[in-house]
Amino acid sequence: MKFVVAILLAAIPSISICKPLPPRDMPAVEVSESPTVDGDISDSAWQRPPDCTEFFHRETGAAAAEKTSAWVCYDSKFIYVAFRCEESKPDSIRAAQKKRGGGLDRDDYVRVDIDPWHTHLFMYTFKVNARGTQTEEIPGVGGTKIEWRGDWLAAAKIQPYGWSVEMAIPWSILKYPSNQSVMGIAFFRRHSRTDQIWSSPDLGPSDDEQLMLNWTNLKPPPPVLITTALAYVNAGWGGDSLKAGLDVKKQLSQQKNALLTINPDFQSIEQNVESIDFTYSPRVLSDNRAFFTEGNAHQSNESRMFYSRSIEDVDVGLKIVGQTGGNDFSGLFCTSGSDDQHLYLKSRWDFGQVNRIGAAITSTRRPGIENQVGSVFGRLGRRSENRTDYIEYSLMKSLTPGSGGDGSITRLGGSGYGGPKEIGWWLYYNNINPSYYAADGIVPDPDLKGISYGANYGNEYSSGRIRQWSVDVSGHSWDLHSGELLSKSLWMSANVASLNSQIYASFGREKRRDEVESIPTLFNDHTFTIGCAWNQQEMYTRGWADVSFGKRAGGNSFYGRVKQGLSLGESFHADIFYEYLRMTGPFAQREHQVVASLAYDITSENSLS
């Protein structure tokens, strides 16, 4: 603990609140004749000089290899955006993704980021590939239903010089204060042939929002408040054959949303399938249910005081989320009966892009269980054009009537990361008291104190056979509160990637205490992993495979897995994932698992799977 504090205190002089850079203004253009969103940028709105023509490589700051032009204008209903993307090798234009909301990371695409509050904190992101497929990121919005997220228009067209895009983003999607005359805006293009992202202006490898253009002289329409209701009926065989439910989302203000769910349709939501690979501790899995993801109420670290996947059924749920200036808050209450109730409240204040403080509480009532947990947390750091470094802390305290269940978790540490040829690092001290208990939370290791650490370094190249490489070193040293060793590890890994393939390898050693037939045992593990990936530029036929082998938990261990995408026609696509585990010794087992998915694209917005 003293060692960690000394290092972090030494870093404080260089980790300070960074001053905003001088603003770059771009006057807004209001149009009386709206452009037609068909991908053809011959409309009169785009015949003036472009707003942006200088694009820069995200990682190095070098000028973009191909010319790109971007325009933006608006009227009383929409924000209109256009891109002209020149391509000297038009046959290389890649636009495989056809499903709206699908990943565009391997395609040629353009993107616009809008900061309506001009606080450099909450970005709206809109992407369109060269086929016209759309995807967006709306701050604090969960779920995938367009009715829930808000609709917008886009189209793309292949041109003799390359390709072009038009977008129409309704003002009603954005949240902004009345009489807002300045917003932040930035433009991006991904070039698949070089696997580069270019931006205008140059935001650096960390997409520093403080460097966004100031879109000035705006006269947006008065903000509107929207209420959305989605009702559903599920029919089935056996047991309850009919179930009806209702989801309602209401904007209380431009900064606050309320959500009500009654008999939510959780069973039709695909959750992540847990791996069969051996682990000493429970895995922390993500939750795809929109009621829980809306507002990003979950904590990001592994020891979570609120872990929504522990709540399986909900009869009625109410949630309020929002942002007020630099304050981000959420409140959640749900119940599946009078004796099963869950409450979660969280508030966070952001000061700049990195610095923050906050607090949270949970309260759980189940048959035979009554439990409360409180938390305070904070972060102080510095973000520059090339990297971000910060120190942070969190303290959680649990209260449970009766004996036991009154403990705490303390976490103190720091982290730093940047672009190519920048050293990444992290160092944390964790103290998890064995008396700590969170009925709606998860703690993979409920009794430990010690440090975890790591560092990485790598580089990227715009041409050549090797496009990226990196090396990583990480480890931890954890003791039980009794003073006995819980776990001590050291891992090393390396990765080399070309434009379309990847090879990676790692080796690690760990001493780990666990129980075998209620007898504490100290295992000496060592594991090798080697893997590769192929067709990484292909949307539907890419794949990867790796194997891990060595000693684990007192026996020999072998674990292998492979994933392959298949294109079965213009509209049929499949993914097959297979994993196999074989172990000897106290935890001897032999298991395998196949996860297969088949999708048929009916339209760009609807599919059967």
Which residues make up each language-model segment?
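Outer-membrane beta-barrel transmembrane domain signature of Gram-negative proteins
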Residues: 202-222, 338-374, 379, 383-384, ...
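Short beta-strand segments enriched in hydrophobic/aromatic residues
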Residues: 85-87, 116, 169-171, 189, ...
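Exposed, low-structure sequence patches enriched in small/polar residues
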Residues: 313, 388-609
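Conserved short loop/turn motifs at secondary-structure junctions
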Residues: 234-236, 245-247, 263-267, 334-337, ...
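Outer-envelope beta-barrel architecture signal
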Residues: 77-79, 122, 163, 179-183, ...
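Hydrophobic h-region of N-terminal signal peptides that target proteins for export
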Residues: 5-17
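Structural preference for beta-rich elements and adjacent junctions enriched in aromatics
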Residues: 18-344, 348-349
